[in-house]
Amino acid sequence: MPRDASELAHRLAREAEAVCRHYLSNGRREGRYWSVGDARNTPGRSMFVRLKGSPKGPGGKWTDAATGEHGDLLDVIRESCGLLDFHDVADEARRFLRLPRSDP
């Protein structure tokens, strides 16, 4: 079971399009990227999530061209679900990945 943030982020990145379809449902696929307004799932096109790794960078990373914000899919889960505590973010990521939840 993944215990640390980087392992969860890697597992989410392998499922980047499914993560985007679930948590960023107001967006859409555009080639190798998922575009949406922002990490809170606002409609628009200023945020891009890289769906697969490429010479430009690893899959699962995103940048919002309007604000300069960037991050990984754990940040998407945090923002789109309105979560504050990392433990809750990790539990939601594990739920999405169908992994056992962490101990409190």
Where are these regions (language model features)?
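N-terminal structured subdomain of primase-like DNA metabolism proteins
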Residues: 1-104
